[in-house]
UniProtKB/Swiss-Prot annotation:
CDD domains assigned: TM_PBP1_LivH_like
Main subcellular location: membrane
Functional description taken from the UniProt entry: Component of the high affinity leucine, isoleucine, valine, transport system (LIV-I), which is operative without Na(+) and is specific for alanine and threonine, in addition to branched-chain amino acids.
Locations listed in the record: Cell inner membrane
GO (cellular component) term, any one: plasma membrane
Species this chain originates from: Pseudomonas aeruginosa (strain ATCC 15692 / DSM 22644 / CIP 104116 / JCM 14847 / LMG 12228 / 1C / PRS 101 / PAO1)
Name the record gives this protein: High-affinity branched-chain amino acid transport system permease protein BraD
Cystine crosslinks: none
Gene name for this UniProt entry: braD
Length: 307
């Protein structure tokens, strides 16, 4: 019985991290699904979101407004607003002027934007780690004790609930709303949507904004879960989320969700079996294994290019 608790604990830990990977991965997959390009500055948008949350919580604490609901609301609201503005700006500056040229040019532009944002944060906030309060300490224990049961922290429960609500809301938006249908139309045939009178530039900008907002939600949740942030967290989080998007099928929103969860679980069990230093090896090994047998990802669809 203790063995079952141990594996269930790893599953819970993996799903916690994986759900946040999924939120970030959706930003990659939505942009790729419409313009066929990867936003390599997306990880830095996530990093900026965590710093905005830190600043919001710190300012409220300095003013004596230390109510947990107020701090959480301020952290989410400020982070989403600021990162959405960054997402829109990245599309306007790094992608839109270069979209009609060689596909490598926007890629290089995005990498340059990523380096610029990371160094801008280093200069403004310094490179030292900063602590974000958890705000929701404590946990539930399912079983006889914490040593012989499954421990789920309040923060993990918050991560599950918020992630589920955000993904459910996004699914409804994409499937039911007029803008969501326009996003799907652009993903199917960008040129045809322009002929039908849909402003594809606005839809593309909207996907960058949505992706940035989802990254902000993940940034606040993971920041409070781990309690520490630094200017370098965006790089690894971005690579992991991109891996999740490719694993599930880049361009597929359900694929990004599934890929994030699978990647998180693979990391958790990989760290448990081989040691924490090998969790990245297991995660990327899983990606290679899936791509060997299904190059389009688990839920990806093969694309036929007309010549």
């Amino acid at each position: 019985m203790p063995e079952i608790y141990h594996y269930l604990q790893q599953l819970v830990n993996g799903l916690t991290v994986g759900s946040t990977y999924a939120l970030i991965a959706i930003g990659y997959t939505m942009v790729y699904g419409i313009i066929g390009m990867i936003n390599f500055a997306h990880g830095e948008v996530y990093m900026i979101g965590s710093y905005i949350a830190f600043i919001a919580i710190t300012l409220l604490a300095m003013m004596g407004l230390d109510s947990v609901p107020l701090m959480m609301l301020a952290a989410f609201a400020a982070s989403i607003i600021v990162t959405s503005a960054f997402g829109y700006s990245i599309e306007r500056v790094a992608y839109r002027p270069l979209r009609g040229g060689n596909r490598l040019i926007p890629l290089i532009s995005a990498i340059g934007m990523s380096i610029f944002l990371q160094n801008a944060v280093m200069l403004s906030q310094d490179s030292k780690e900063k602590a974000i309060p958890t705000l929701l300490p404590g946990n539930f224990v399912f079983g006889e004790s914490s040593m012989n049961g499954v421990v789920i922290s309040y923060m993990q429960i918050l991560i599950f609930v918020v992630t589920f609500l955000v993904m459910f809301g996004l699914t409804l938006f994409i499937s039911r709303s007029r803008l969501g249908r326009a996003c799907r139309a652009c993903a199917e045939d960008l040129k045809m949507t322009n002929l039908l009178g849909i402003n594809s530039n606005n839809i593309i900008a909207l996907t960058f904004v949505i992706g940035a907002a989802l990254a902000a939600v993940a940034a606040v949740l993971l920041g409070m879960q781990y309690g520490v942030i630094n200017p370098g967290i965006g790089f690894l989080a971005g690579i992991k989320a991109f891996t999740a998007a490719v694993l599930g099928g880049i361009g597929s929103i359900p694929g990004a969700m599934l890929g994030g969860l699978l990647l998180g679980v693979a990391e958790a069990f990989g760290a448990d079996v081989f040691g924490d230093q090998y969790k990245d090896v297991v995660a990327f090994g899983l990606l290679i294994l899936v791509l060997l047998f299904r190059p389009t990802g688990i839920l990806g669809r093969p694309e036929v290019e007309k010549v």
